[in-house]
Amino acid sequence: MLELGIFSSNTQNIGQSISERFAGIFPSWPIMLATLVSFTILLVVLTKLIYKPVKKMMKNRRDFIQNNIDESTKQVEKSNELLEKSNIEILDAKIKANTIIKDAQILAEEIKNNSIKDAKDKSKQLLEETKIYIRQQKVLFAKESKKEIVEIAGEMTKKILSESDVKLEDSKFLENLLKNDITK
């Protein structure tokens, strides 16, 4: 039984110990009220001294970042517009350059054709002048040939006449006849 008595006193001690501990967990009302008031004061002070300045600083920083983002967006849009404008100007310049090249090629072709035409005209003119010169030389050669033939014929006639007894008048007649034939 003694054992039972020890067991029951231990149980009572344990029950009291647990009750004391639970009673120690809950503070007294005045301490709890003082803690609550001091926590509220601390919360108000921290809000005024730390939270509001930190919140204001964060808002300023957020506004600064947003302004930078907006500015960057505007700059990107502006640079895209300038890029598009420069691409259009480059395209216009290429079109103008191609037009200038085509015009230059057409002009060069015209100059080439005119030069070829002028050269052909000059060669035709030179050919005509050469033909005229050749005709003149032929006529001159024919006249000179006839003249030489007449002279040779005259000399031969004189020889023949001198060997024969034909009169001098007949020889003059032959010379006149040959000379008239040459002048025609």
From Swiss-Prot:
Stretch forming the signal peptide: none
Membrane topology: Single-pass membrane protein
GO MF annotation: an example: proton-transporting ATPase activity, rotational mechanism
CDD domains named among the record's database cross-references: ATP-synt_Fo_b (cd06503)
Alphabetized Pfam families for the sequence: ATP-synt_B
Protein family: Belongs to the ATPase B chain family.
Protein name: ATP synthase subunit b
